[in-house]
């Protein structure tokens, strides 16, 4: 009786582990303002991170333009050091649903 209960418990545990939902990220393939990049995408199972790439920021007066970004799902997101000098584009990674909305 105990072994039958244990088998049922294992089957339920195995089933529930396989039912996890994929990560959801905001995505936009083309660079656009941060406020405009709001498409929600269910990522592939191998994607483990949401990635935001900062493409440009206005560097001249009046400094009121929104940042231009791309956002995507990523299976191997490698963030750039925000203090790095000369980086072509800053890359930010996060690891929960819809976490890449800021910037």
From Swiss-Prot:
Granulocytes. Expressed in skin. Predominantly expressed in the granular layer of skin, notably the acrosyringium. Identified in several biological fluids such as sweat, saliva, tears, plasma and urine. Gene3D superfamilies: CD59 (2.10.60.10). The keyword Isomerase does not apply. Residues 24-73 form the UPAR/Ly6 domain. GO terms for cellular component: extracellular exosome; extracellular region; extracellular space. Changing residue 86 to R: In MDM; reduced expression of the protein. Induction: Regulated by retinoic acid, EGF and IFNG/IFN-gamma. Down-regulated by IL-13 in cultured human bronchial epithelial cells (related to asthmatic condition). One of its GO terms (biological process) is locomotory behavior. It is linked to Mal de Meleda: A rare autosomal recessive skin disorder, characterized by diffuse transgressive palmoplantar keratoderma with keratotic lesions extending onto the dorsa of the hands and the feet (transgrediens). Patients may have hyperhidrosis. Other features include perioral erythema, lichenoid plaques on the knees and the elbows, and nail abnormalities. Homodimer. Interacts with PLAU. Interacts with CHRNA7. PANTHER family: UPAR/LY6 DOMAIN-CONTAINING PROTEIN (PTHR16983), UPAR_LY6 DOMAIN-CONTAINING PROTEIN (PTHR16983:SF16). This is Secreted Ly-6/uPAR-related protein 1. It comes from Homo sapiens. The gene is SLURP1.
């Amino acid at each position: 009786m105990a072994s039958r209960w244990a088998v049922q418990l294992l089957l339920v545990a195995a089933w529930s582990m396989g039912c996890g939902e994929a990560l959801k990220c905001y995505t936009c393939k083309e660079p656009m303002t941060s406020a405009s990049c709001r498409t929600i995408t269910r990522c592939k199972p191998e994607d483990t991170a949401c990635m935001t790439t900062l493409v440009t920021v206005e560097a001249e007066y009046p400094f009121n333009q929104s940042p231009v970004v791309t956002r995507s799902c990523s299976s191997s997101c490698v963030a750039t050091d925000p203090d790095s000098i000369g980086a072509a584009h800053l890359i930010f990674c996060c690891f929960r649903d819809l976490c890449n909305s800021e910037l």
